[in-house]
Amino acid sequence: MESIPISVEGFRRLERELERLKKERPGVILAIKEAREEGDLRENAGYEAARERQGMLEARINYIESRMSRFNVIDLATLGGEQVIFGATVEIEDVDTGDVKKYTLLGPDEAEPSKGSISLLSPVGLALLGKFVGDEIVVDAPRGKINYEIVSIAFHGPIAAADD
């Protein structure tokens, strides 16, 4: 089984989520029991909603648990260098438009593009891995191929924990 990189903070966030989800289980089971006692299950919206919630809850618990043993937990504070690797914050410039973007490369289970972090397994992440300042990459995007130049590579240590 292939390991999955994740920051210490990302791992802790998933541990907290798993703990919270497991604490929700009894309440969902109780909601199902109470809805079942209301009678006819074919037209019982409360029962259907509780069963749906249980399904989503169990699916997320199973997903997280299946990933936990495969994680390669990496302390971002120990990273550095001149090459793009997991944990690097990379500034890239669109060669054609001059638009500049900044991304931190993280694992697929903690990447949040809206907050500036992308998965190292995303098309941009894969194109950046192993590159240096001044290198150019080409990314296939819906609007066509985009050429970027790597402007800077930095390592900032632990990322700020997102509010849970």
Swiss-Prot record:
It comes from the Bacteria. SUPFAM superfamilies: FKBP-like, GreA transcript cleavage protein, N-terminal domain. Residues 12-38 form a coiled coil. GO terms for molecular function: DNA binding; RNA polymerase binding. GO terms for biological process: DNA-templated transcription elongation; regulation of DNA-templated transcription elongation. It holds the Pfam family GreA_GreB_N. Keywords: Coiled coil, DNA-binding, Transcription, Transcription regulation. The keyword DNA-binding applies. Belongs to the GreA/GreB family. NCBIfam families: greA, PRK00226.1-2, PRK00226.1-4. Necessary for efficient RNA polymerase transcription elongation past template-encoded arresting sites. The arresting sites in DNA have the property of trapping a certain fraction of elongating RNA polymerases that pass through, resulting in locked ternary complexes. Cleavage of the nascent transcript by cleavage factors such as GreA or GreB allows the resumption of elongation from the new 3'terminus. GreA releases sequences of 2 to 3 nucleotides. This is Transcription elongation factor GreA. It comes from Solidesulfovibrio magneticus (strain ATCC 700980 / DSM 13731 / RS-1). The lineage of its organism: Bacteria, Pseudomonadati, Thermodesulfobacteriota, Desulfovibrionia, Desulfovibrionales.
